[in-house]
Regions:
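Short, solvent-exposed amphipathic alpha-helical segments in soluble enzyme
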Residues: 30-35, 40-42, 63, 88-90, ...
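Glycine-rich, aromatic-bearing surface loops/beta-hairpins
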Residues: 80-138
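A phosphate-binding glycine/aspartate-rich beta-alpha loop in the early core of alpha/beta enzymes
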Residues: 36, 40-70
Length: 138
């Protein structure tokens, strides 16, 4: 039996193939994962039902499996910061700043970037609950 938190074989395999500078997208249930990622991006569909798992559930497991060098989030534009951003900061222990990208800039980054190795779809219902992680060195 594995002694790590991540037990999903497809996810473990994908993480093992990530290298420095590769990116991992964890997206909410509203994110157009098929049309806003490249054909070379491995996609894992973890959503079981509405709200399960959440983006933060997945982030908590990943953060113990990889080093994160950079984190980017999708902002709704002007107005209040989404509450989930505070949760993101708490989970990553403020080790890296959350770089904010506008909605369409985030989509473009996800679609055009050839180094997005993995995209994980969740059942998250909160809006703007998407985070793009850049894998750091060990």
């Amino acid at each position: 039996m594995l002694k790590i938190k991540c037990l999903n074989p497809q996810l473990i395999n994908a993480l093992a193939h990530c290298g420095h500078g590769d990116k991992i997208l964890i997206c909410d249930g509203n994110y157009p994962i098929d049309s806003c990622t490249s054909e070379t991006t491995e996609k894992i569909y973890l959503q079981l039902t509405h709200g399960i798992p959440t983006v933060t559930d997945v982030l908590k497991v990943l953060i113990e499996s990889i080093n994160v060098e950079k984190a980017q989030v999708m902002t709704p534009g002007e107005g209040q910061e989404p509450e989930i951003f505070k949760e993101f900061r708490g989970i990553i222990n403020n080790k890296v700043e959350l770089d904010e990208l506008g909605r369409f800039e985030f989509y473009d980054e996800s679609k055009k970037s050839n180094n997005i190795r993995l995209a994980i779809a969740t059942g998250e219902k909160r809006t703007f609950a998407n985070i793009l992680l850049t894998v750091g060195v060990a």
